[in-house]
């Protein structure tokens, strides 16, 4: 899945904290950062 938006443009996905305005524009999933938003870490953070 991609992230689900929760609060103020932030989202959480499987323990991953994501930010809309982060440089890469995507979010970590099981294979790395391939979903819509970026996250500073991994799925298992």
Curated annotation (Swiss-Prot):
Cellular location(s): Secreted
Please list the disulfide bridges: 3-16, 11-28, 18-33, 27-39
Q: What positions are modified (6'-bromotryptophan)?
A: 37-38, 44
- Just give the chief location class: secreted
| Tissue-specific expression | Expressed by the venom duct.
GO MF terms, alphabetically ordered = ion channel regulator activity; toxin activity
Quote the cellular component terms of the Gene Ontology held in the record. Answer: extracellular region
Q: Does the keyword Disulfide bond apply?
A: yes
Q: Could you tell me the superkingdom of the organism this chain comes from?
A: Eukaryota
- Please list the residues that carry the modification 4-hydroxyproline: 23, 40
Which UniProt keywords are listed? Bromination, Disulfide bond, Hydroxylation, Ion channel impairing toxin, Neurotoxin, Secreted, Toxin
Q: What is known of its domains?
A: The cysteine framework is XII (C-C-C-C-CC-C-C).
* Role according to the record: Mu-conotoxins block voltage-gated sodium channels. This toxin reversibly blocks voltage-gated sodium channel in cephalopods, with no alteration in the voltage dependence of sodium conductance or on the kinetics of inactivation.
In Swiss-Prot or TrEMBL terms, this protein is called: Mu-conotoxin-like Cal 12.1.2b
């Amino acid at each position: 899945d991609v992230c689900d938006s929760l609060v103020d443009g932030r989202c959480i996905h499987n323990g991953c904290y994501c930010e809309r305005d982060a440089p890469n524009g995507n979010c970590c999933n099981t294979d790395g950062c391939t979903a819509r938003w970026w996250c500073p870490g991994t799925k298992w953070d």
